């Protein structure tokens, strides 16, 4: 008697069970906040305030953009004044003496590290961090 190889297709259940046993990667949740600064500053000045990250920072001075490599993804600071060009925003910025606005984008899994970075920046530059709907 010859040995026959089982040529039957695996059942859909078997394939699904195998997939569910594999490690599932978490879905990235990118967050955006805004850093409102009451003084003129540049992205290079901000980078200098983060000595522990000097080897993890990339700067694009012409775009006023800084990218920091964190544990799960990157944290990006990007000048965002044009996001707040309407007169209501401008009145708010004038009343609160806001001179510079950066959009901050990061992975939710890096939130604790982001809080430490923002705390360091705020200690030197003051200002506040908020979501877009919290600004006015």
Where are these regions (language model features)?
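Sequence/structural signature of long amphipathic alpha-helices
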Residues: 35-36
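Short, compact, well-ordered microdomains
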Residues: 98-132
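Intrinsic structural disorder/low-complexity segments
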Residues: 16-18, 26, 125
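Short acidic DE-rich linear segments
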Residues: 134-136
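Intrinsically disordered/low-complexity terminal segments and short unstructured peptides
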Residues: 4-6, 15, 31, 68, ...
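Intrinsically disordered, Lys/Arg-rich low-complexity segments
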Residues: 1-22
């Amino acid at each position: 008697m010859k040995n026959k190889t089982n040529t039957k297709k695996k059942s859909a259940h078997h394939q699904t069970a195998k997939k569910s046993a594999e490690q599932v990667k978490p879905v990235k949740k990118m967050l955006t906040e805004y850093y409102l600064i009451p003084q003129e500053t540049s992205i290079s000045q901000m980078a200098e305030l983060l000595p522990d990250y000097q080897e993890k920072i990339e700067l694009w001075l012409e775009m006023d953009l800084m990218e920091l490599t964190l544990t799960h993804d990157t944290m990006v600071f990007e000048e965002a004044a044009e996001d707040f060009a309407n007169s209501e925003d401008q009145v708010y910025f004038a009343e609160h003496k806001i001179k510079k606005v950066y959009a901050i984008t990061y992975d939710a899994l890096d939130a604790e590290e982001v809080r430490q970075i923002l705390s360091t920046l705020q200690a030197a530059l003051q200002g506040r961090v908020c979501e877009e709907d919290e600004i006015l």
